[in-house]
Amino acid sequence: MATYEPVIGLEIHAELKTKTKMFCASKNDPDERHPNVNICPVCTGQPGTLPVINKEAVYHVIKVGLALESKIAEITKWDRKNYFYPDLPKGYQISQYDEPICLGGELVVPGFSKKIKIRRIHLEEDTGRLIHEDHIGHSMVDFNRAGVPLMELVTEPDLNSGEEASAFAQELRLILRYLGVSDADMEKGQMRVEANISLKPTDLKELGVKVEIKNLNSFKAVRDAIDYEIERQSKLLDGGKKVMQETRGWNEAKGRTIIQRSKEESHDYRYFPEPDLPPIHIIVDGRASPALAGGPPTVGIDLEKIESSIPELPSQKRARFKNNYGLRDNQTAILVSNEKLANYFENVVSEFMNWDKEGPDKDSLLAPELDANPHFIEKERQEIINLSANYLLSDFLGLLNETSAEVGDTKINAENFAEWACLIHRGVITSRAAKDVLKEMWATGKDPSQIIKEKNLVQVQDKSKLEETAQKVIDENETAVSDYKKGKEASLQFLIGQVIKETRGRANPETIAGILKKLLH
């Protein structure tokens, strides 16, 4: 059997967050549930109507291009892509063919340390949505989506597996969200992935026949469909058969791709320049090019203004969290994957950073024994930052998931969370009691110290009291004591649990373990 190298390129469409559609004033509302309400004569292709460019959508695509280090075209134009389909009311789609807004660029795929080159990013209008109702025997069309601004990003064929492709798509979605240009919610169809897959023998440079898989609407579907297609093509080639150039779809239920139609080429769409829209000129340094003097009318876009609005990107935030706060890769990955959670974490960290400026009362939370020693305080600060990250990614995220809440919905402000983490680190409360305090903070928004005082949750530090409680548990559990002395370590855990129960969760398990071992020997 021959050995093949998968060669994969992606085409990713993302609906852009704008108030209105791409070429008309109809509302762009992805959450609209009533069909055919956000429409007008322009987006439904009525005779005599003229399109007007949505500048906000152009800004968004340029912002994405700059974030991905693309070359921004000085002049870009519009083209008509001609084809017939029921969800395309005009009979053509306004898109960009030979002069896209962005050319080139790259994106590093997290976890693979691999740069994937971008071929182009362009802007077009979305189609309507077909709704198939089997029980009534026909399909219906909703044009609310028709004309919505749609960004299309095309990669070079630099990917080699379904896992890589899925990771690329996830990182792109995160960038789009950080930039604020798209929610890219795949469940709502706001981001759709198409994959072009071919196989080539590892000892040859010539690429194999390309197969396109359309409209993959989840990251799992991207991974599974590509991996299936690689296997399907491998079996064909190993059996002496040819791979046909075609478009296929992904059947999630059956776990396989299915043929839809033969693959179209660009000439099948009969592209020609859009006669009703002027080209766009990208202005650099606020100055228009002299070459445009006396030329056709243009729409000017200020590149510097857009560039200045680009925030810190996910890859930059991961690196900063790792370098500045000493977080592990898995911690930074989860924190940065949710921008609101990352911002909340930063607010918690800023509390620790500011405490040394707020007087001894705050510093004593970090280092009560040596609150005058700045080096000791800094060491404690770093430990608590790491502790805070751990609790955010476990207990705090758990509460978010349990209540189906967003980070912005929490009643726990950053200052209270920071104080809570410090109290755990100092041993004022046990980890078990800390969970109860956090739940109470979640429900009420109260200060953790207030909750600890009200519920009498301060950790028992009196060794004589702990020894007394431990002896009581030993006396009342002869069977467990006997089992432990026979070598059953699980019995010790049972006894520790009983002591913790007696102290209502206010005893440190490690301290109790030491006391029990001492008393039992």
Residue ranges and their predicted role:
Residues 1-285, 299-312, 323, 329, ...:
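Basic, nucleic-acid-interacting segments
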Residues 55, 144-147, 162, 166, ...:
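Conserved structured core elements
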Residues 241-285, 298-489, 500:
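Long, charged, helix-rich clamp/arm modules that form nucleic acid-engaging surfaces
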Residues 9, 58, 169, 223, ...:
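Hydrophobic face of alpha-helices
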Residues 286-290, 294:
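Intrinsic, low-complexity polybasic segments
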Residues 2, 143-148, 186-193, 202-205, ...:
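C-terminal non-catalytic interaction appendages of large macromolecular assemblies
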